[in-house]
Amino acid sequence: VDSQIIDKTKLIYLTYPNNPTGSTATKEVFDEAIAKFKGTDTKIVHDFAYGAFGFDAKNPSILASENGKDVAIEIYSLSKGYNMSGFRVGFAVGNKDMIQALKKYQTHTNAGMFGALQDAAIYALNHYDDFLEEQSNVFKTRRDRFEAMLAKADLPFVHAKGGIYVWLETPPGYDSEQFEQFLVQEKSILVAPGKPFGENGNRYVRISLALDDQKLDEAAIRLTELAYLYE
């Protein structure tokens, strides 16, 4: 990144495991970011919403890096790891000045959350430490099985290191939106086209692993029937 741009940057927003790509970060990635911006006016926000899903290695926290709390906060969500999607329950920890600023902003933009949801979140955090690992193992098993079926049919995909999605490359002659429509009409499979996620996503569609094994297996079988499109 151009040094002049960095000099004017007030906030760096990181998210690992990344949504939408599923890429993960090592501790060295965070160490480098902290070293670069420590002592400057630039702060770092790390969105750790998919932190529970580290399939090939445990996902590091930016706050575990030396001086992490000097420049960063980390945002946690109960939506994915604790199956509380839609309830909008989460929290932030880290640099005290950033937390105070966030608290001041939230006071003027948020009227509060239904108390029962807060109680449920607190109970989950206090009593289900092993649940996140169980969740990760469930999705790892799904990923391994789904990707193995795609690989057996020589379908090109991006190996998912984290998150809950698999990216399938589109066949020649199809962009992401065209292939998404084809899958709906011909195979009754609903995926997300990659184009809305950025120009580089236009040759891919995103497939969610948040389905039971039987449905994922059936989706994989239907996809493998399209191997001829890639020839």
Specify the residue positions occupied by each region the protein language model found.
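A short linear hydrophobic-aromatic micro-motif
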Residues: 153-157, 190-195
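Hydrophobic residues in well-ordered beta-strands that form the structural core
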Residues: 13, 46, 191-193
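Conserved core segment of the aminotransferase class I/II
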Residues: 65, 69-140, 144, 148, ...
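Conserved glycine-rich beta-strand-loop-beta hairpin in the small C-terminal domain of fold type I
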Residues: 122, 138-147, 157-169, 201
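PLP-dependent enzyme catalytic core of the Aspartate aminotransferase-like
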Residues: 2, 173, 182-191, 197-231
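Active-site pre-lysine segment of PLP-dependent enzymes
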Residues: 1-8, 20-44, 48-84
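Helix C-cap/helix->beta junction micro-motif
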Residues: 39-40, 153, 187, 230
